[in-house]
């Protein structure tokens, strides 16, 4: 009986994680990628034919040109990578965290951010990032989902449970990303985005 309850709890947990992941992904698309002049792709595969353990996939990748009227403006564009993480367990799953852009963000819940705070401060997260994704940039920020009319400080004190059915939500940057250098060529990343599509 206990084993059945444990299996059911794991199944419910997985469903909750899946719902939260979908919610965060849809919110990101709605907030950051809608409108004209937005260049982005979902589930961008990098090195898909590499040996086992080497292929990378970025949940969302965006190309932000400096302008669109001159080639030089396009060449000055930057890449922003977004990794969706529903909970702390998801962060440490060994999947994702492929920070290949000049800017990179973890998109998560306030609850998950609060659980990660100590690991961010004491270097636990940095060590994990280096172990599971050695080519990833340490230039990353964190965005959290908060109810539309809420202040981020209030949400930090008393997080609202994610509920896609009720109310409007927004993404707020709780940890800024300082841009870093990209190691992959622009042509390669644009090709990977094009191959992945939406």
Regions found by a protein language model. Give the residues of each.
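Non-catalytic C-terminal interaction segments of nucleic acid-processing enzymes
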Residues: 2-31, 35-40, 48-52, 124-198
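Short regulatory "switch" loops immediately downstream of catalytic or recognition motifs
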Residues: 61-69, 109-121, 146-148
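Short, flexible loop/turn elements at secondary-structure junctions
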Residues: 44-46, 62-64, 85-88, 110
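Accessory alpha/beta interaction modules
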Residues: 15-26, 81, 86, 91-99
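Active-site beta-strand-loop-beta-strand hairpin of nuclease catalytic cores
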Residues: 53-81, 87, 95-99
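Short, well-ordered coil/turn elements that cap or connect secondary structure elements
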Residues: 35, 76, 99-101, 137
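Short, charged, amphipathic alpha-helix that recurs within catalytic cores of restriction-modification
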Residues: 85-133
């Amino acid at each position: 009986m206990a084993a059945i309850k444990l299996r059911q709890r794991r199944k419910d947990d997985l469903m909750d994680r899946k719902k939260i992941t979908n919610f965060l992904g849809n919110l990101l698309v709605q907030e950051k990628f809608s409108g004209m002049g937005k260049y982005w792709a979902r589930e961008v595969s990098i090195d898909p034919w590499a040996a086992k353990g080497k292929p990378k996939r970025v949940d969302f990748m965006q190309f932000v040109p400096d302008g669109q009227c001159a080639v030089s403006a396009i060449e000055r564009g930057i890449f922003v990578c977004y990794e969706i993480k529903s909970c702390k367990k998801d962060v440490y799953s060994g999947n994702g965290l492929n920070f290949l852009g000049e800017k990179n963000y973890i998109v998560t819940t306030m609850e998950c951010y609060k659980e990660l705070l100590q690991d961010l401060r004491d270097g636990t997260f940095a060590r994990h990032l280096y172990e599971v994704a050695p080519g990833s940039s340490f230039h990353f920020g964190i965005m959290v989902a908060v109810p539309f009319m809420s202040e981020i400080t209030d949400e930090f004190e008393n997080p609202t449970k994610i509920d896609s059915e009720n109310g409007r939500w927004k993404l707020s940057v709780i940890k800024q990303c300082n841009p870093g250098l990209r190691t992959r060529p622009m042509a390669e990343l644009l090709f990977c985005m094009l191959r992945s599509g939406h």
